[in-house]
Regions:
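Bacterial N-terminal signal peptides that target proteins for export
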Residues: 1-10
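C-terminal motif of bacterial Sec signal peptides marking the signal peptidase cleavage site
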Residues: 17-20
Length: 397
């Protein structure tokens, strides 16, 4: 028994010695203990047992815009006046009483530029008609023309390809510019400048009706609640850009914005208006950053630059998406409530890229940051406005 006790004692001393050798003086030892995780707030709100959240309007407004893009603009399918009439009818009247034409740049902040923005859309319809062969004796034959420097046409190997695109004489795929106008001038404008306009949540009448639970006719929510929910609904269309993988600068953006929406809505329910304003500011700042990062990344990402270096035809869609993303930046907001960029400024960026031979000018586009009209130059200029650098938007692999 004594012998066994001696053996156990020796083993204990040996283990203690080994344990002490595995730690160095001053070393931080990671504990197995983890602080309990606080669950993310949920964007689910009810009144008398039924949901008080409704953003159906968002999809009803989006559907005709998606239809215009996919059925007519992307495929240059406005070969006859009847098709042009349908496109304009969808844009002017939409469906279910929601008219895209009336909702574009509808915020008071962009009222002064609204006419010019609508003219840009009209020009896209006109250019698409031309690319489609509208007014030509044989529209189908005219449409079957490959784009090249100074001449609009299809971009791809064959006219029958699935992923076909159509560019104007500058190499700009106008369908992608249309999307940029929609993402910025409707969705982003609705989020930041209409439904999250801080003046709404300071309005005495709206606050009083909200606190008295004065619901909108036939609905289960107050006017203030509905404004916040519609902002959240339109944000769903920006969510894929927020979730863009591999960009460290946006790594926390999704959860930050989601939490801000959920916490802001809860604060609104509890009449904590200071908290509502704090969350509103967070959404404004973070989503504006997302828009800027997206524009910069589309211009100078490895995908864009790689395709441009290999075959410019493969890069035109990405470059045009970048132009559309630049256009959308006029709808982003500073903390002060003023736009980061004006209509004229974003147009100047696009004009710089499309000057001369436009997006066909591979040498200029691939120039360094100091080269006017290069992708890096324009992206860097945008970055300065938002406090971002080209290094900030590099992917981590």
């Amino acid at each position: 028994m004594k012998k066994n006790t001696t053996i156990y004692s020796l083993l204990f001393l040996l283990l203690s010695a080994l344990s002490s050798c595995s730690q160095w003086e001053g070393e931080t030892v990671e504990s197995a203990y983890r602080e309990p995780q606080i669950p993310d707030p949920s964007y689910q709100f009810k009144r008398t047992g039924s949901s008080s959240v409704d953003y159906l309007e968002c999809s009803l407004l989006r559907d005709p815009l998606d239809y215009i893009y996919s059925s007519y603009l992307r495929t240059a399918n406005i070969m006859y006046e009847s098709a042009m009439t349908r496109v304009k009818d969808y844009f002017d009247h939409g469906e279910f009483g929601l008219k895209p034409q009336e909702e574009l740049a509808a915020s008071p902040l962009h009222k002064a530029d609204r006419k010019r923005i609508l003219n840009d859309v009209e020009e896209i319809f006109k250019v698409t008609g031309k690319l489609s062969g509208l007014g030509q004796p044989s529209p189908g034959t005219y449409r079957n023309h490959k784009a090249k420097i100074g001449e609009g046409g299809y971009v791809g190997i064959h006219i029958g390809d699935v992923n076909i695109a159509f560019a104007d004489e500058k190499g700009l795929v106008v369908a992608e510019l249309f999307n940029g106008i929609v993402w910025g001038g409707i969705y982003l404008d609705k989020i930041l400048n209409v439904h999250l306009n801080d003046s709404l949540y300071n309005d005495t009448r709206l606050r009083r009706e909200h606190e008295n639970t004065s619901l909108l006719p036939g609905r289960n929510y107050t006017e203030l609640e509905h404004h916040w929910d519609l902002a959240y609904g339109y944000y769903q269309y920006w969510l894929p850009f927020v979730q863009a993988g591999g960009l460290p600068v946006l790594r926390e953006s999704r959860i930050k914005i989601y939490n801000a929406f959920a916490r802001g809505r809860l604060a609104l329910t509890e009449y904590r208006y200071d908290e509502v304003q704090q969350q509103l500011q967070l959404i404004r700042t973070e989503l504006s950053k997302v828009a800027a990062v997206r524009a910069m990344n589309l211009l100078v990402s490895d995908i864009t630059l790689g395709n441009l270096d290999e075959d410019i035809n493969n890069a035109l869609v990405f470059l045009s998406q970048g132009c559309g993303a630049l256009y959308a930046l006029q709808f982003t907001l500073q903390e002060s409530g003023k736009p980061h960029l004006s209509y004229n400024q974003v147009k100047s960026y696009i004009n710089e890229l499309t000057a001369g031979n436009g997006l066909w000018d591979k040498k200029r586009l691939l120039g360094d940051e100091a080269t006017p009209g290069s992708l890096k130059h324009v992206a860097a200029q945008v970055g300065k406005v938002y406090g971002l650098t080209l290094n900030d938007i590099k992917r981590s692999y």
